């Protein structure tokens, strides 16, 4: 069985890695199974640093579609055309997609229209806000998937309430835990920990990555002020992308502990 595994961004690889290792093990055990990793971005994507794939013990993507951009419709159209060509050149029986990105939806649609089986990892997640582009993506992908792999029972309930075929739903748990367990021996205190005046159990970790939140200054400002108030004297460590840093700084808030 040939499987095409799609990744639309760096975080997807954290969830793909355990699957790749499992398929490798099955193949070594004599199973007739293989996979091809397709990244919808560019080969020179700066977010895919050299250590990423070695850290995850997985091979680099077999193909790069080279699609990027901010306009959802243009990106979706470009990915669909490129992925169509990819499947023409490298046929598969199953297309496995992850999460709820535009790439996830685009590749799932292409696969379904070609009569292929679609597997969705992290299925059933819902915000119940259709103004969020990702909510649109995940709802569409779940509706056309043949294998719905969920991380929790709430996701199962969401899919059942939407009328999904029960036999399609598979509760497998949070696959990120597999990645954490695989790398737990490497989880050591970084050298900069003490230089920032941090102590174990005495700091908060913050990450922000939703564009729709970052673009709503009033909401973002309220969130940051609430966080600062609740944190008190506790330092807040925020490993964020540069555009997130700019969005926070543009608020002009006094947050010396951030």
Q: What kind of region is each of these model predictions?
A:
Residues 5, 37-39, 120, 171, ...:
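Structural beta-sheet core signal
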Residues 19-33, 226-233:
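A short, Lys/Arg-enriched amphipathic alpha-helix followed by its capping loop at the start of a domain
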Residues 42-47, 66, 144-217:
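A nucleotide-sugar donor-handling region in carbohydrate enzymes
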Residues 50-52, 188-258:
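Donor-nucleotide binding loops and adjacent catalytic segments primarily
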Residues 31-75:
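Conserved nucleotide-sugar phosphate-binding/catalytic loop shared by glycosyltransferases and other
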Residues 2, 32-36, 117, 168, ...:
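Residues at the starts of beta-strands that form the adenosine-phosphate
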Residues 8, 39-42, 123, 174, ...:
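Cofactor-binding loop segments of dinucleotide-utilizing enzymes, especially the Rossmann-like FAD-
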Residues 4-7, 12-24, 28, 52, ...:
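Active-site and donor-binding regions of nucleotide-sugar-utilizing enzymes
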């Amino acid at each position: 069985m040939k499987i095409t595994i799609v990744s639309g961004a760096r975080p997807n690889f954290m969830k793909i890695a355990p699957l790749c290792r499992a398929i490798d093990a099955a193949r070594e055990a004599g199973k007739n199974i293989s996979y091809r990793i397709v990244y919808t971005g560019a080969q020179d994507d700066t977010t895919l640093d050299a250590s990423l794939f070695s850290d995850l013990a997985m091979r680099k993507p077999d193909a790069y579609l080279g699609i990027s951009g901010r306009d959802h419709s243009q990106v979706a159209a470009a990915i669909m055309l490129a992925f169509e060509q990819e499947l023409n050149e490298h046929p598969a029986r199953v297309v496995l997609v992850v999460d709820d990105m535009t790439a996830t939806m685009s590749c799932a649609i292409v696969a379904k229209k070609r009569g292929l089986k679609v597997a969705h990892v992290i299925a059933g997640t819902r915000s119940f806000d259709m103004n969020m582009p990702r909510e649109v993506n995940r709802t569409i992908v779940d509706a056309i998937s043949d294998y719905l792999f969920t991380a929790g029972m709430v996701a199962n309930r969401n899919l059942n309430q939407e009328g999904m075929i029960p036999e399609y739903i598979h509760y497998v748990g949070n696959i990120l835990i597999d990645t954490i367990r695989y790398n737990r021996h490497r989880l050591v205190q970084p050298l900069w920990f003490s230089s920032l005046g941090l102590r174990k159990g005495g700091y908060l970790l913050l990450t922000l990555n939703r564009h729709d939140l970052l673009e709503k200054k009033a909401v973002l400002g309220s969130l940051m002020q609430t966080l600062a108030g609740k944190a008190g004297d506790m330092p807040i460590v925020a490993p964020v992308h540069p555009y997130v840093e700019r969005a926070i700084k543009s608020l002009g808030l006094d947050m010396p502990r951030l």
